[in-house]
């Protein structure tokens, strides 16, 4: 009987954690992602206009956003719902638009900007989420 109970418990746990849902079926409430239909904090995988993993309502790991036509719009990493590490945004033609880094949800260091042909047009230097220097090419 114990083995059967353990089996069903593990099925429930795996099923709960491995839920996959379209991003449009989620909503933000108090800084957390909730399943719109059942109004519960979501844990699982998200696909659609944004793809990534959610743990206890917070984005985790690598995430990607997409234009309506399916081309990549942005890619970056999250830790407990905050942007961290390298962040890249793209023009609709697939060329990089901007690239920089986040730390604890805040832009830091040099952020570079590019035109639709991929030519660098500017750099902005961030400190404490504020642009301290702009350099135009």
Where are these regions (language model features)?
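Sec-dependent N-terminal signal peptides
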Residues: 4-14
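Glycine/tyrosine- and acidic-biased, solvent-exposed loop/turn segments at the edges of beta-strands
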Residues: 14-137
